[in-house]
Amino acid sequence: MTLTASSSSRAVTNSPVVVALDYHNRDAAMAFVDKIDPRDCRLKVGKEMFTLFGPQFVSELQQRGFDIFLDLKFHDIPNTAAHAVAAAADLGVWMVNVHASGGARMMAAAREALVPFGKDAPLLIAVTVLTSMEASDLADLGVTLSPADYAERLAALTQKCGLDGVVCSAQEAVRFKQVFGQEFKLVTPGIRPQGSDAGDQRRIMTPEQALAAGVDYMVIGRPVTQSVDPAQTLKAINASLQRSA
């Protein structure tokens, strides 16, 4: 579905669904995007697509009415991370993220870089523990905490730095809502409708389970992008979430 809209007049959606665009072919990506409605989801653009197609690709998605989560996971010295986050805000994206493991000074600098944008600033989210990581992966890095405990430690640091929320696994959402409050946004990848393949995610939930756990925004990729009828798949997911609410 093609709409004409600027980044300042993006279509508004109440859906918590964020579709991950993981394509290496621009035409294939746009063919998919033109099948879905910006009222049914937001879109996530990650490292591969942004590196291949650049800021213009983000602008084209916005012109079709979509809010964009720019998933580049900035992790650098504070000044560089701050400039990168400000550049994302200049693009008019809805959400941008950094790695919480970059530390307090980096996250604080990123937050401060968004102050001049006022109400037009994107949500600033920090990545805690990648959902593909298990305890053995953390142990290889010298981290003796469980993924859940380490994610909570990083989430606490994120909130202390004044960011809007974190990317976390759905399993961590219940505790995070209790500890950090309702206003602290939880963004969760690894969401798979019932019957979907787990893919490369290790800690997964269905959309209904994620909503019940307190997830604010759920990232769904292949179950939608590889669907024979992605528009209908999105509508079915949103309908199931409304029934569960």
Swiss-Prot record:
Gene: pyrF
HAMAP family to which the protein is assigned, alphabetical: OMPdecase_type1_B
Keyword terms, alphabetized: Decarboxylase, Lyase, Pyrimidine biosynthesis
Gene3D superfamilies (alphabetical): Aldolase class I (3.20.20.70)
Function: Catalyzes the decarboxylation of orotidine 5'-monophosphate (OMP) to uridine 5'-monophosphate (UMP).
Active site: K73
Enzyme nomenclature, EC number: 4.1.1.23
GO molecular function, one term: orotidine-5'-phosphate decarboxylase activity
UniProt: substrate binding residues: 22, 44, 71-80, 131, 192, 201, 221-222
Organism: Escherichia coli O6:K15:H31 (strain 536 / UPEC)
Highest taxon listed in the record's lineage: Bacteria
Catalytic activity: orotidine 5'-phosphate + H(+) = UMP + CO2
Protein name per the record: Orotidine 5'-phosphate decarboxylase
One term under GO cellular component: cytosol
Pathway(s) it belongs to: Pyrimidine metabolism; UMP biosynthesis via de novo pathway; UMP from orotate: step 2/2
